Amino acid sequence: MADNPVYALGAKYQLPFEAVKTEVNLWHYRMEDVFNQTYAKVKFSTDISAVNFYLTPSYLTQKATGDETGGPLDTYQYGFHLGAKFAGADITYLYAKTGDDTVLTPWGDEKVVIQQVYQSARADEEVNALKLAYDFEKLGLNGLEAYAYYGQYDVPENAGSDFSEMNYSISYKFSGALSGLGLKARYATIDFDQGENFNDVRFYINYKFTLGH
């Protein structure tokens, strides 16, 4: 499978609507003797008073081809993000439904729900998630951002264990003499209905710089 070439064709188009900004994304991938994938996503957004509302539905299909070296595959995933931004806050509800087979993503992620540890990918899985993010710039704390992100992952009883994941993240981007430096801390708790629960802690240090002029 690793030696199979991948062919990709994509397009993005901004529709000429003023009241509701609309961006259409369409991609098709072909991996010989593995699978074909088609992915479509539409981004809608509009401002009502001081609130920005947005809706991002998406649909993905995957079907094995040729020698099926990645295994038999015939599945889909659809879902959406529905949210609102106001005064530095961004609240989003996310929903995803996956078809009969687990989604295969060897080169990237087009899944609807992507959390710190898990993502919407299992066969016959339904995911409901809620994310609350806040940019503290409105409070005079430039560069400070945080979010809490909860997801509930459910599958049929004979397909595996239901579980939930809770994420917490805080990040800070420095300015002035330390411009380009960023710190980030993330913490996740995963709670399985059947199985061992665990926590995941991550720390990041980033530094962005340019070479030359």
Predicted regions and their residues:
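Outer-membrane beta-barrel translocator domains and adjoining extracellular loop/strand segments
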Residues: 1, 36-41, 64-74, 103-108, ...
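A C-terminal functional module that forms or caps the active site or interfaces directly
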Residues: 137-182
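Outer-membrane beta-barrel "beta-signal"
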Residues: 8-9, 130, 168, 172, ...
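Transmembrane beta-barrel domains of Gram-negative outer membranes and organellar outer membranes
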Residues: 186, 190-191
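Residues that define the transmembrane beta-barrel architecture of outer-membrane proteins
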Residues: 3-7, 34-38, 51, 74-78, ...
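Detector for outer-membrane/organellar transmembrane beta-barrel domains
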Residues: 14, 41-152
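Short loop/turn motifs that connect adjacent beta-strands in outer-membrane beta-barrel proteins
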Residues: 15-22, 47-53, 137-144, 175-183, ...
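Internal metal/ion-chelating core segments
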Residues: 1-44
